Amino acid sequence: MSSATSGEYWLISVPGEKGANDAWDKLNRSTGNTSTNSKYLIPDLKVGTLDQLVGLSDDLSKLDTSAEAVIRKLVQYFTEVLEEDKSKIAENLVIGNKDMKTYVTKFQWEGAKYPLKQSLKVLSEIIGKQISQIDNDLKVKSLTYNNLKNALASMDRKTVGSLLTKDLADLVKADDFVLNSEYLQTVIVVVPKISVKEWEQKYATLSSMVVPGSSKLLTEEGEHALYTVTLFKKVIDEFKNTARENKFIVRDFVYDEETLKAGRTERDKLMAEKQRQYAPLIRWLKINFGEIFAAYIHIKALRVFVESVLRYGLPVNFQAAVIEPAKGQQKKLRQELHKLYIHLDGSAAGPIDTLEDSPALMSLGVNEYYPYVFFKLNIDFLNK
């Protein structure tokens, strides 16, 4: 049987029947080749009062939305951190040693994290705190790592672009300059390639006190060439102005070995710190994806339990299932489920065939209504 590749699952529950597996067997017979079904093993939880269940239904809906939002945020950031290793994201989205599909279809309640002796309200609060903690930690860790990345990116941006703007540190060396002179200074000039001959003919006349023969070509990139020229310090401003009038741009650059070395050292430090933080961050993202995904599926289990009790009443007796629609079979599957469970909505007014048959439900903002408890689960977090 071919299954859907969209990561979509339907979490449903229907009333239990006399035989332990009667409801389950009936579901499997009816859905046939339209889906792959797994039991959603939700344990006996503390029911509480009807008022508590109604309030909890709304709380769990909000918690569900919040958990999914944090998961998507974490996965998106995980993908960004992996950078050129983005293809490895899927293998890191695991819960312990299980992939998402296995965790969902072979779900087992984690009693150590979410003790069954606790009330539904307390369980939802435990999960809520867990989600908030992961969300807050993600903000802190992403801010710290992003600051490093941004500082490195800022440094790297200076090494690209045209000779008019880029950092010159890697293009020059001490031998290109007259250093430690009381009177002389070497400046760097950006010359349009089409004006190179003009520069070589005119540079010594752009102001007085330019050292003849001191112009030296350092490099050429794109539409510009980079030259040095040596002149007396007291005429530098005059030289800059005259050069600009001739479309020769004097870069604001003074060669200082210590400053250049410090810049290179700073980048090396940032790169080393980024590499130092990378592995622990990947590990944290992987572990906490597993934590929040597990919490998310437990929220779904709580929602199925609460809605089943509200809809089917006491004593608690329902069959929950994880249904994976086969590719292209969603419509047919929905029809089969409708035929199988339409009787659950039997009333004096007759069963609800479509949502339009119930203005009351539509007025409450219900967008999807089925005669059985239904929640959609989409585990494709890599696509929005």
From Swiss-Prot:
Expressed ubiquitously; higher levels are found in gastrointestinal and hypodermal cells, as well as H-shaped excretory cell. GO terms for biological process: embryo development ending in birth or egg hatching; ovulation. It comes from the Eukaryota. InterPro entries: ATPase_V1-cplx_csu, Vac_ATP_synth_c_sf. It is a peripheral membrane protein. It is found in: Cytoplasm; Membrane. GO terms for molecular function: hydrolase activity; proton transmembrane transporter activity; proton-transporting ATPase activity, rotational mechanism. Disruption phenotype: Worms display embryonic lethality. When vha-11 is silenced in adults, they are able to produce eggs but egg numbers gradually decrease and worms become sterile after 24 hours. This sterility continues for about 4 days and then viable eggs are produced again. The keyword Phosphoprotein does not apply. Keywords: Cytoplasm, Developmental protein, Hydrogen ion transport, Ion transport, Membrane, Transport. One of its GO terms (cellular component) is intracellular organelle. Its main location: cytoplasm. It holds the Pfam family V-ATPase_C. Subunit of the V1 complex of vacuolar(H+)-ATPase (V-ATPase), a multisubunit enzyme composed of a peripheral complex (V1) that hydrolyzes ATP and a membrane integral complex (V0) that translocates protons. V-ATPase is responsible for acidifying and maintaining the pH of intracellular compartments and in some cell types, is targeted to the plasma membrane, where it is responsible for acidifying the extracellular environment. Subunit C is necessary for the assembly of the catalytic sector of the enzyme and is likely to have a specific function in its catalytic activity. Vha-11 and vha-3 are transcribed on a dicistronic transcript where vha-3 is the upstream transcript and vha-11 the downstream. V-ATPase is a heteromultimeric enzyme made up of two complexes: the ATP-hydrolytic V1 complex and the proton translocation V0 complex. The V1 complex consists of three catalytic AB heterodimers that form a heterohexamer, three peripheral stalks each consisting of EG heterodimers, one central rotor including subunits D and F, and the regulatory subunits C and H. The proton translocation complex V0 consists of the proton transport subunit a, a ring of proteolipid subunits c9c'', rotary subunit d, subunits e and f, and the accessory subunits vah-19/Ac45 and vah-20/PRR. Belongs to the V-ATPase C subunit family. This is V-type proton ATPase subunit C. It comes from Caenorhabditis elegans. The gene is vha-11.
